[in-house]
Amino acid sequence: MPTLAPSGQLEIQAIGDVSTEAGAIITNAEIAYHRWGEYRVDKEGRSNVVLIEHALTGDSNAADWWADLLGPGKAINTDIYCVICTNVIGGCNGSTGPGSMHPDGNFWGNRFPATSIRDQVNAEKQFLDALGITTVAAVLGGSMGGARTLEWAAMYPETVGAAAVLAVSARASAWQIGIQSAQIKAIENDHHWHEGNYYESGCNPATGLGAARRIAHLTYRGELEIDERFGTKAQKNENPLGPYRKPDQRFAVESYLDYQADKLVQRFDAGSYVLLTDALNRHDIGRDRGGLNKALESIKVPVLVAGVDTDILYPYHQQEHLSRNLGNLLAMAKIVSPVGHDAFLTESRQMDRIVRNFFSLISPDEDNPSTYIEFYI
């Protein structure tokens, strides 16, 4: 029986050295995680563990950012499942990353290796191995977490019972790489960046990180939603239409983006942001597997795919591509929302229905045979 973190509390697990697919080594790595629900195994020895994968700037406390979905009696039912959410390797919320201390007593900084989505999954596999968990009932994740979920199904089919892949693609598109590289450049152009070795300077590249967040946040929201909320309105008591442009005289949407930037700067590390954004740029399920469609067809883990109809960052046609080529499509669903990419986090009613049906499909309730999933292709 694995010794797990107390329910709802952050715990750190040592996983040893992590070798990246590009040939680097992250020595003495640690993974931070949260756990909810009791661990059990069935008579075949398969566990009731559900592994949740967070998005780019998320963390392991899924009960916070998916509060409407995770808990006793909820869609991700902790009365039934042992739910585990890790902080990704390279992150800044407890797992080893650029802002962590290297074994030599100094910060990792820019010595921290570049990582891929596959490296992130391999680190999580080492984490499960360290806990003594050999199987999981399901893996669920959206955005960068969806990319990890898809790679889990491709890399470790003997471990994963089923997967729910949300709001992501089979590989990074040129547009995604471009918009994400612009965010990286904003941080690297901050004079406090110091090539990633700023941790001992006492000055963080906050301006660059804030600029990156402004760019990113526009891709997380729907164009129509942003326009309907703000239009061309001026921020209260400010005048962006004066005779000279002044930075403190803003449109309302500028104030909103400033607010989002300030929030992220207070809680996230720029080094981790660059590292994880670069990992998203490297995402390609087909690399060294014969191309996208061949790689998807080879995935035999049952996979539910869901996307958002107004997603700018990962347009819905990318989830349609997944659904048409996966080797074992469990179901396909569309989240209908003006919100855009973030709808998998904010549209709780639709997500509740999708996730409940996902678990009903992988663990049918004999007392409720009418379980179904809605298809929107």
Curated annotation (Swiss-Prot):
Q: Give a GO cellular-component term.
A: cytoplasm
Compartment list: Cytoplasm
Instruction: Reply yes or no: does the keyword Acyltransferase apply.
Output: yes
**Top-level lineage group:** Bacteria
- EC number(s) for this protein? 2.3.1.31
Its UniProt entry gives the catalysed reaction(s) as:
L-homoserine + acetyl-CoA = O-acetyl-L-homoserine + CoA
For substrate, which residues are the binding ones?
213, 342
UniProt cross-references to InterPro entries, sorted A to Z:
AB_hydrolase_1 (IPR000073), AB_hydrolase_fold (IPR029058), HAT_MetX-like (IPR008220)
User: What effect does gene inactivation have here?
Assistant: Mutant cannot grow on minimal media with no added methionine.
Domain AB hydrolase-1, residue spans: 48-347
Catalytic residues as annotated in Swiss-Prot or TrEMBL: 143 (nucleophile), 311, 341
Major subcellular location class: cytoplasm
Keywords from UniProt, A to Z, are:
Acyltransferase, Amino-acid biosynthesis, Cytoplasm, Methionine biosynthesis, Transferase
This protein's assembly is summarised as: Homodimer.
Alphabetized NCBIfam families for the sequence: homoserO_Ac_trn (TIGR01392), PRK00175.1 (NF001209)
Annotated function: Transfers an acetyl group from acetyl-CoA to L-homoserine, forming acetyl-L-homoserine.
* Record-stated family: Belongs to the AB hydrolase superfamily. MetX family.
Name under which the protein is recorded: Homoserine O-acetyltransferase
Q: Record the organism.
A: Corynebacterium glutamicum (strain ATCC 13032 / DSM 20300 / JCM 1318 / BCRC 11384 / CCUG 27702 / LMG 3730 / NBRC 12168 / NCIMB 10025 / NRRL B-2784 / 534)
Upper classification of the organism: Bacteria, Bacillati, Actinomycetota, Actinomycetes, Mycobacteriales
